[in-house]
Amino acid sequence: MKLIMHGLYAICKLAMFSLQTSTAQSVQPDDLGFIIATPDDLFQGGARSETNYGDPSKPGLYVIRITFPPGAGSRPHYHSTARYITVIKGTWYTSWGPKADIYNPDDMLAVPEGTFIYQPPEGHHYDMAKDEEVIVQIMGMGPVITTQIPQPGQ
């Protein structure tokens, strides 16, 4: 297992240098510690997530797949740990960095099927499917905390 993890780490580090740039998401608790998250709080337009391995809220490796129907996407956010993403199906659209603090679907990079993306810890981003269903696979080390970036008027 250690050899596999070291190999995965080396591959991801190499890929990170060639391409840097989403997600079962969580919301933060209120002042009393309660969390109530509707699907619209987590994703816009009905994206759904399944956990294939591990648990993103617990220590250790996790693998999740997110299916974005056409028009579905996440709101601007960031994660506490790095994430390694492969676009399995469709063309995914993403925005990252300071410009990703404000949602603008007209200023996104088209990411074709088969693309690998490394998202560094606390890298601000958002993503979506535009005209077709998109499936992405996300790997990372838990526990991961997702923080939403407040939008103007919220």
Question: Can you describe what each PLM-predicted range is?
Answer:
Residues Y62-H79, V111, P120-P121:
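Conserved short histidine dyad/triad with adjacent acidic residue
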Residues D106, M128-Q154:
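Double-stranded beta-helix
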